[in-house]
Amino acid sequence: MSLKERFISYGYLIRLDKPIGTLLLLWPTLWALWLASSGVLDLSILLIFVAGTFLMRSAGCAINDYADRDFDRHVKRTQGRPVTSGKISAKEAVAVASFLALCAFLLIQPLNAFTKQLSVLALLVAFIYPFTKRFFAMPQTVLGIAFGFGIPMAYAAILDFIPLEAWFLFTGNIFWAIAYDTAYAMVDRDDDLRLGLRTSAITFGQYDVVVIAISYGMLFLSHLWVAQLANLSNYFLVGWFAALACAIYHLKLVSTRNRENCFKAFRHNNWLGGFLFLGIVLGLGVH
């Protein structure tokens, strides 16, 4: 394999071709950064968190491919992934994940000690998540914790403590992850059943769409509560209702239980997260 081909394989390993995961990790972090700073955010902190989000998502993808290498070869959608196809060794995947995680940790050195302590917990959860699909009936919950760690870290970096609103935001993000990743798990449900893996789509079975609806409901309720605690103006509702419309559209898609529609609903959650961010920006900036 030439050097160019190897770098291309590394790009696929960390999903440079699929930015949706980075965006789903970034939106909750941006929600928290704007709320914690009351809309007046230091540019250096913003850049640190944006870059850190990219690095940690990339590290998570690498460790995920390492963990799933023996399963991916049995699923048509994942057979071409670099590790399971043999383009990158398992040891290389671990090395890439470790290097990216180290870069992320070095990146946050200008931040306070509390943020650094939280980053260690975030790293542990991110690296544990891929293995939970073997024994935990709801790995999406762990994903929600991993994808939401930017929330307490953002508050810690700006305020040096974590207020009540942050925990409502964090809890809402866990429910959001359950919603969008259950839709994603519905795509591979037949393969996961055959391989003996655990996902929320398998755990809830025929009630999968109901669980997605309830999870979305909890997300939107949490944001309403956060809006009250943060004293956001009613302009927050512009983004909130736009996000709600997205969720209704997603429920229409997943109710078909068609693979393509479920995957479309998963990807479309980027818009939902973006609209909730818009609501926070408007709620803070327009009174």
UniProtKB/Swiss-Prot annotation:
Pfam families: UbiA
NCBIfam families: ubiA_proteo
PANTHER family according to UniProt: 4-HYDROXYBENZOATE POLYPRENYLTRANSFERASE, MITOCHONDRIAL, PRENYLTRANSFERASES
Catalytic function, reaction form: all-trans-octaprenyl diphosphate + 4-hydroxybenzoate = 4-hydroxy-3-(all-trans-octaprenyl)benzoate + diphosphate
Record-level Gene Ontology MF annotations: 4-hydroxybenzoate polyprenyltransferase activity
Keywords for this protein: Cell inner membrane, Cell membrane, Magnesium, Membrane, Transferase, Transmembrane, Transmembrane helix, Ubiquinone biosynthesis
Entry function: Catalyzes the prenylation of para-hydroxybenzoate (PHB) with an all-trans polyprenyl group. Mediates the second step in the final reaction sequence of ubiquinone-8 (UQ-8) biosynthesis, which is the condensation of the polyisoprenoid side chain with PHB, generating the first membrane-bound Q intermediate 3-octaprenyl-4-hydroxybenzoate.
Entries under CDD domains matching the protein: PT_UbiA_COQ2
Cofactor(s), names only, from the UniProt record: Mg(2+)
Bilayer topology annotation: Multi-pass membrane protein
EC number: 2.5.1.39
Sequence intervals crossing the membrane: 7-27, 30-50, 94-114, 118-138, 142-162, 167-187, 209-229, 235-255, 266-286
InterPro entries: HB_polyprenyltransferase-like, Prenyltransferase, UbiA_prenyltransferase, UbiA_prenylTrfase_CS, UbiA_sf
Protein name: 4-hydroxybenzoate octaprenyltransferase
One record GO biological process: ubiquinone biosynthetic process
Annotated metabolic or biological route of this protein: Cofactor biosynthesis; ubiquinone biosynthesis
Disulfide bridge partners, by residue number: none
UniProt family annotation: Belongs to the UbiA prenyltransferase family.
Subcellular location: Cell inner membrane
Any one GO CC term of the record: plasma membrane
